[in-house]
Structure formats: structure tokens, C-alpha cells
Amino acid sequence: MNFEEAEDINGIRFAWNALPSTKVEAGKVVVPTGVIYTPLKQREDLPVAVYDPIFCSNQNCKSILNPYCTIDPSGFWRCPLCSYRNPLPAHYQGVTPENLPLELQPGSSTIEYITARPVQNPPIFFLLIDLCQDEDNLAALKETLIVSLSLLPPNALIGLITYGTMVQVHDLGSEKISKSYIFRGDKEYTEKQISDMLNRPTSTPQGQLPQFANSLTRFFLPVEDVEFQLTSILENLGKDPWTVANGDRPLRSTGSALNVAANLLGSTFPGFGARIMLFSAGPGTLSPGLIVGPQLKEPIRSHSDIDKDNAKHFKKAVKFYDSIAAKMVKNAHTVDIFAGCYDQIGMLEMKNLCNLTGGTLLLSDAFTTSIFKQSFLRLFNKDHEGYLLMGFNGTFDVKTSKELKISGLIGHASSMNVKTQNVSENELGIGGTSQYRLCSVSPQHSYAVFFDVVNTQSLPQNAQSYTQFITHYQHASGTYRIRVTTVSNFLTSDEQTLTNSFDQEAAAVLMSRVTLFKSEQDDGADVLRWIDRMLIRLCQKFADYRKDQEESFRLGPQFQLYPQFIYYLRRSQFLQVFNNSPDETAFYRHVLLTEDTNNSLIMIQPTLTSFSLDSEPEAVLLDSVSIKDDKILLLDTFFHILIFHGKTIAQWRKAGYQNQPEYENFKLLLEEPKQEAAELLVDRYPLPRFIDTEEGGSQARFLYSKLNPSITYNSSEFATNNGAIVLTDDVSLQVFMGHLQKLVVSGSS
């Protein structure tokens, strides 16, 4: 069964491609019946219909006409999800198997409808710029923002807020002089207060009282009209003039700026696609939303502080930013957060602003780095027709046939609290609804959807369940579009059929998402114990072994890689937070919850490629035995691309052999991994950090931290020259598998 082919067509990867036929059987398979779905997955041959879809008339269903529907000669179609008989529209009469409309053709399991309903407003971009940063960093940010103006659609609306100790809302409609409104940075304003302050009277006949209209639209003007004015304002921005006392941090009003922006946008364009883009160079030091106090002697919170409840500002800040996130979701607006500093800015506290709205969370050391510049500009990538590859103001509906119910979703979405008949009482992730808000959606965004098998009766052979995913969104071209994917799965009670249908890669990614979801509520050690229990139970169910005989343990090819995926997940930065700041953890987890199966797997278990003079490049084990003196290694962790030169290669490079004509082959060897790394960098978002290092180099630690430590300073192979020695007390994959086998065959859980 080729799972990747199905993903290329429908953007879908099921953990179980055949589903257990009853609720009892589903409870025994351990890995949830779930799917990783990428609604806007790019596809060159995507069927596109320039008309509105036909919906099922059953008010409890409302699914869309699809290739699994049956058409009868009397002019009716039967819905595969609810079995309701619907009359075909008049212009569909005469449909035959040889003359099918586009949506009924077998290749239209995924189809996009361009509806007749026009979008009333173009996309809106609201820039929030932190002025509490050094001149070089600010200059680089301004330069990148000015470049980005040319990438926006000319009719896109744009607004600007700058902030330091005060919050400044810029009136871009004022041509002759630069005009702005100042708000206090230490005050939380209501939507009404902001609206009352910024609305201005419209001209009225003499003798009448002035009437207030919504003149707030003057803060959001078309890029083509204000590009010169906005460029001038950006070029003239300087560092926040407020003096910073010795031993203090700058007084930075991040919370107030976001509060003003969310309320102003909500008063002006509720329910229309809009993005607030925050560019922050440090933590908020003013309430509301204070992350750390102004005095440098107060350290910013660590993971340990949060775990021990010693982070005195943490809960209050989370509550404040979560309230803004709820407001953004209600208005269908998105927040993107870009950090450009070595310090933490409070991403952990602010993460739900992005997680609930589908926004970008980007961590970089400075706005001068290519990681920030290229990643930010890639956000404005366009399709072959020249439209932005971003959807706005979306909703995501999940429809199922009667055998399944929806347990929940894990990904960057929020519940719309629509509890239909196919919503399960057993929640996993964001549950209790069959409809989700996607304030922003792109070809990258992937969602884990989990199902509950509710059927209790045995079913006939070849029984099928049906699932339909419906994504409504505002396209950058100014149209409303509907992407529809309909799939069917066999329901089976045959264990061998289930085994053959298991996609271990999709299963590992689904379990990683469940693990991250649990990590938000439970203690880290409890989460690790839970993963281990699930792995033991899966192996007890599907491995071949004789009780109490470890050497008899065998896993079939469908399950063989799964334990090592879990091993690397346990060791990953997603769960082992010891060496990361809370902001880094929030960033890494955010990206894992965005990406599809293949990219998520690279994050969980990075890829390692070996290059040598006497052989072609080859994929090698992510293991310390793969480090050889005469080889170059290319490591891809998704967040880092690292080229590691073995000891001998590094010595030859230092000696300059590559510059001598007789060693042309050595020069080509040095170039080969660089070319492959460049190919990996082309489409990756966010842009990974590129590292070029060698044996003994300080940055070689990035490679060593990812390798399975099969040879450590205290292992019996310590004295051999069979690979590199890893200075760690971590358990190796071999020891992990040994423990797993022992527990499985003993019947322990």
C-alpha cells in the first residue's frame, strides 16, 4: 500500500488505512484511528470547479456531492455519508457514467470550488514594530519590511503601530505631515475606548450634533496608495527615545500594543481576513502582558521556575494574551510573532495568539539574520497565478458516516463549538465540535483529526466508512473557495488486514501530536511514561513473541521502524526541555504542530547522509558509528542543516588540497553536501540554520546531540575505532529496544 501516493492526491495520511470494525476492536489497537490532513496541499492537477457545490439536503449531514455518491436513473443521488436521497439539480439531469460532472469523476476525491460570492475586503496586514532595539537591528528590520511591501497585493490594506514605552498608532492617510495617536503602554484599553478615541466626527449640516461614523478605516489603507508614505515613515523610525536606567531593561509595552491592535482591527474589519504581524526584540516589561520586571536583577522565567510555580508573572501574562487570542479567533484574525533577539520575548506566554489563529511563530537571534529575512519574505510566496499562498478567515468541517464520530483535532485551529450528531463524547485534542475556525491556512498547515469507531455490531465483509473534509476560506484573489476531500476506508475485524494497513510514519506523527497535547497539561515524566506504555501495548498486540523469551521477539515490516521513531521522539527537544528556554520549546512545538508527515518525521528523527571519495552519497544510521574520519556527513533536523567533516577530511581541507588541480575530486566532494544542503534550503519554512563544522569543532555538538549514542565513554566499545564516542549518559537505541522486548515478552505494561 503506497501511503505517499494517497497523500499526494488528497493530502491525507491515516495511521490505519483500514479501520477496526467495532468500538471494542478499536480500543485494542492502541494507536488512535486518526489522520494527518493538509487541506490546501498543492497539486498541479487539482480539479477546480468555477461554481458553487451541491450539498446534501439532510440538515444533519450537509455533505457535498462527491465521487462516492451513487446516481440513479430517476434523477436522484444518494449521499454515502448519511444514505439520504437527494434530487439532482435540473442542469444535472441526464448524468450518465460516461458523462459525469467534474465533482463526480473518480479523480475528484479532492476538488476546489471557486464560489460566486465575492470577498468584500482585500486581505489586511497590521504591522507592530518594537522600537526598543539597537539601531542596527532596527535598520535591518525596516529594510526587510520595505522590501515586503512590494510582495503584497497592491489592493491589500496595511496599518502600522510602533511601540516602546508608549504605543503609537500611525494615521497613514495624512499625506503632508506624519500623524499618529499615542496610547499609554501600561494600560489595557477596551474596544469601545479605542473606538471612541480614534473615531472622528463626520461633517454634518450646521445646527446638528456631530454623528460618529466608523472612520477607523483610515488606519488601514491600500498598499498602492500609501507605499511612498509608509516607506517614508519606516525609514524615519528611530530607537525608542525613552531613557533606560542603568541596570534596567527598556520599558517595552508589547501587551498594550497587541491589545490596541486587536481592538482596533476588531472594530474595523470583524470577520475579514487580517494578520497582525508583531516584530519584537525583547520581553514585555510593562503590564498588561508583562513577562519580566524592568530591573535586570530579576531573571526571566525558566522551565524550572514554571514547573515549580516560581514564575510570578507567568499565569497573569498567559491569561492576558489568551484573552486577546480569543478576540482574534472571534473576528477571524491571525497573529504572527517574529522574535529578533538573543533574549526571550515571552513566546511561551503568547503562543496561543499564533496556535489558535494559525499564525507564524519565528525565533531568530536578530532581525539582521538571513533566518529572519528570508523566512519572513517566504511568507509572501505566490502561486503560479501570482496570488499569495495564504488563505484567510477559514472554517474546517469534518463529516463522517455513521460508523465514525469525531474525537477532536490537534493543530493550529480553534473550536467553533458546533456539536453535530457525529461528535464523540471521548475527546482527544480540541473536541466537542465538528467545525473549526482556521483564521489562517496555507499549503503547509496540517491538522491531526482523530476518530472514534462507534459501531458495535459486526459488519459485512468489505464494509466501508466515509469521511469528508470541507475547508471554506478566503483566497488571496478576492474569492471565497471551498476545498473538499472525500475518502473511504474499509472496516475490518481481520488483524492481518489491519496490520497491512498500518502507516507507521503517520502513526508516529499522530502520537507525537497527542504527546505534545498531553505535555501542555501533564508533568513531563508522566508524559514519557505514557508514551512508553503505549509502545509496550502496541508491541504486545502486534509483535510475534513467546512469553518470557526475549530472543523470540519479532516486529513485522509495518511496525519495524515505529519503536525507533518513539525513541527519538523521547530524546527530542519537543519533550526534553533541559537545554532549551521556554520560548525555544514553544517555537519548536509550534512548528511540529504545523507540518505534514514527512517534515514532522525529519524533526522527530533527523536524516543523516554520508559523502565519501569512493562511493555515492548514501543515507546512514543516525548513530555515532556513522562518524568516520574519511567521510562528510549532512544532518537535516528541519531546524538545522549541518555539514560535518570527519577528522581526515578536515585536515585535508585545512591543508588546501581542494585548491590544487590534481585533487579536483576532493574539491567536488567538499561541494557535494553544500549543493544538497542548498536544495533543502530552497522551500523550507522557517529557513533552517546552516552550520559548517568538523571533528572537534564547537558546533559539532549539534550533530552529537542527535545521534544514537551506541558508543559512549562508558561502553565496552570505548577503545575501538568503530565510530565516534558520545559523552552522554543517555540510553542508546539498542538498550531501549532491549528493555522494550523484555517488558513486552514478560506481559508487563
Curated annotation (Swiss-Prot):
GO biological process, alphabetically ordered: COPII-coated vesicle cargo loading; intracellular protein transport; positive regulation of ER to Golgi vesicle-mediated transport; positive regulation of protein exit from endoplasmic reticulum; regulation of COPII vesicle coating; reticulophagy
Reported function: Component of the coat protein complex II (COPII) which promotes the formation of transport vesicles from the endoplasmic reticulum (ER). The coat has two main functions, the physical deformation of the endoplasmic reticulum membrane into vesicles and the selection of cargo molecules.
Listed GO MF terms: GTPase activator activity; zinc ion binding
Cell location: Cytoplasm; Cytoplasmic vesicle, COPII-coated vesicle membrane; Endoplasmic reticulum membrane; Golgi apparatus membrane
Binding site for Zn(2+): 56, 61, 79, 82
SUPFAM superfamilies listed in its UniProt record: beta-sandwich domain of Sec23/24, C-terminal, gelsolin-like domain of Sec23/24, Helical domain of Sec23/24, vWA-like, Zn-finger domain of Sec23/24
Keyword Nucleotide-binding carried by entry: no
Quaternary context: The COPII coat is composed of at least 5 proteins: the SEC23/24 complex, the SEC13/31 complex, and the protein SAR1.
Keywords, ordered alphabetically: Cytoplasm, Cytoplasmic vesicle, Endoplasmic reticulum, ER-Golgi transport, Golgi apparatus, Membrane, Metal-binding, Protein transport, Transport, Zinc
GO cellular component, one term: endoplasmic reticulum membrane
Gene from which the chain derives: SEC23
InterPro entries: ADF-H/Gelsolin-like_dom_sf, Gelsolin-like_dom, Gelsolin-like_dom_sf, Sec23, Sec23/24_helical_dom, Sec23/24_helical_dom_sf, Sec23/24_trunk_dom, Sec23_24_beta_S
Species of provenance: Scheffersomyces stipitis (strain ATCC 58785 / CBS 6054 / NBRC 10063 / NRRL Y-11545)
Keyword Metal-binding attached: yes
Pfam families noted in UniProt: Gelsolin, Sec23_BS, Sec23_helical, Sec23_trunk, zf-Sec23_Sec24
Family of this protein: Belongs to the SEC23/SEC24 family. SEC23 subfamily.
Protein name as annotated: Protein transport protein SEC23
UniProt topology in membrane: Peripheral membrane protein
Highest taxon of the lineage: Eukaryota
